[in-house]
Amino acid sequence: MTMTDPVADMLTRLRNANSAYHDTVSMPSSKLKTRVAEILKAEGYIQDWREEEAEVGKKLTIDLKFGPQRERAIAGLRRISKPGLRVYAKSTNLPHVLGGLGIAILSTSSGLLTNQQAAKKAGVGGEVLAYVW
């Protein structure tokens, strides 16, 4: 069975594992999911990620990050642009998540970028995939 929205599936798996205080979460891998994991690691929301060979295809395993008292590094994840309703942002109107405390993940012509990275590159807007805070 094909998956309609792999990014939403990834975010749901992360959200569920995070709320259950799991140390790792696994899912089918793709280039888009790998790039989202790279962004989450660079922004400090996850500890690490790795791709492993599975019986069919590849598997993406993400190590979640917790504080010294088991506080979650990810407070929330929200899918914005969905298959039924795409959401786009111009370079002049990029979203701000929680007044700059969170990030928006954008799919641009320059690849996947955060809203801060897209703001630094003049004239880059794109599809708003998700908010992370």
UniProtKB/Swiss-Prot annotation:
It holds the Pfam family Ribosomal_S8. The keyword Methyltransferase does not apply. GO terms for biological process: translation. GO terms for molecular function: rRNA binding; structural constituent of ribosome. InterPro entries: Ribosomal_uS8 (IPR000630), Ribosomal_uS8_CS (IPR047863), Ribosomal_uS8_sf (IPR035987). GO terms for cellular component: ribonucleoprotein complex; ribosome. Keywords: Ribonucleoprotein, Ribosomal protein, RNA-binding, rRNA-binding. PROSITE patterns: RIBOSOMAL_S8 (PS00053). The keyword Flavoprotein does not apply. It comes from the Bacteria. NCBIfam families: PRK00136.1. Part of the 30S ribosomal subunit. Contacts proteins S5 and S12. One of the primary rRNA binding proteins, it binds directly to 16S rRNA central domain where it helps coordinate assembly of the platform of the 30S subunit. PANTHER family: 40S RIBOSOMAL PROTEIN S15A. Belongs to the universal ribosomal protein uS8 family. This is Small ribosomal subunit protein uS8.
